[in-house]
Amino acid sequence: MAPQGQSSSSRGGRSWLIVLVATVGSLLISLVAGTHVIFAVITIPLVISIAWSSPELLITIMPVWMVFLGFVRRFTPGGGNVTFSGDPVLIIGPVALIVLMLVTVNTRGAPPLSKLARVVLGFNIVAILEVANPKQGGLMAGVGGLLFVFVPTLAFWIGRRFGSVDVLWRVAWNVAILSLVAALYGLYQQFVQFPSWDLTWIESKGYTALNLGSGIVRAFSTFSSAQEYAVFLSVGLIVWSVLAAKSVRMPLPLHLAAMTVVALALFYESQRTSIFLSALALGVVMAARLRMRPITVAIFGVSAVVVLVVFAGAIGGGGGSAALQGPDSTAAVLANHQLSGITDPTGSGSSLPGHIKATRVGMFSAFKNPFGHGSGSTNLAASRYSTTSKTAGTEFDPGNMGIAFGIFGLIIYFLMLWRMTAMGYRLAIVRRDPLGLLVLGVIMATLLQWTNGNLYSVCWLLWFVVGAGDGLLSRQDAEVDLTLPSVETAPAFTWRKPGEPRRVARI
């Protein structure tokens, strides 16, 4: 409760100012000192303090930090090392989630366990047990793997407890604005130049996935990878679309302009998977808004993808950007790469067949190794800490679950896939407002990427949004059960003895 004469909004603004000053100050100190250790030493106690005093504020801030994590790592000199991450700033996000989880456990107000919550709990238990799997190449690989597989899912439980309607909308607006900022920075990288700190990172990491040939390098904006950038733009595009249906929003011309910038950045980033998932999510959200049946919603989503392929074929057939700007321009190379992959997703120049094959191999490996290879076998922990494991992650969740958790992982994941999509659809139908569409849209935009902890800014966000949606739905169901009117039962029938007068029932 706010003190007398001081509104909650003013306290929230003051808290934001304190966090901003402390973060910028520690960033400048680390810049001068040439090490990330100082930044982490200053920031982590601040994160813990905010988590205990105002968890909702920290949840609202989390998207900002996760989006700018890659930028901070590149802009400031590195230095230092820690056992689990190699860069101390990487543990700030996991620390925030762990402390928020402790706050969640120590406070009341979480709704009763739903069917989805029970499945997620089973997933968490399996992830912890798989830490001890010897096939991943050591205990350190398993513990490190928890940072990518287990810790992001803590946001589900945090969302169930603290994901109120107000908090969820604040997070949504932050994600929308951040996607616009990231899109503008990514377009600057793509069509103007890469700043010196980004060029240094490209050269030092030798990131071959960024190179499209003809001297064209993919943009990655403020993120740690081009894939993370693309997935976040996809989520941002869905959020902007849902916010357009909200009563309180930006003026429509500005709103549409923001959506256009994000969509252009997503297109020119040239990641086909995110384009397909964006079309799928938009189709599903549109059908859910019309309150169609589940099968019709699925058909709408698939139809949106088909329309995308047909439209891309029409543009590509006409020469696309090459006709306007020349075949060697940056825009033409990016557009032709994108359009060729969309119109012929299984062609020789597409990476989709390879991803599907790797996913299929990963799923079938669950039958050869029923207990999997461990929590750290499909993420960065394997390359950093594993001593014997040679397994690698696939592009999609089913393959990763088959490799990491074996047959149990596959069963739990497909149960989770069913329960999560069902919850998102039911929330959208029951609430009849943009908030339900938001949860369903984010689920679809990140489909088959839910356990990819390498997507720092996206993975935890998906789990928080899903947890918040599940919590809202569970509370609504509980309120309905409490408010159902009691039905009076008719008196039990008894036989009348011979000669006994009739009894008049009193109502």
Predicted segments, located by residue:
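Interfacial loop-to-transmembrane-helix boundary motif in multi-pass membrane proteins
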Residues: L58-I59, V64, A110-F123, I158-F194
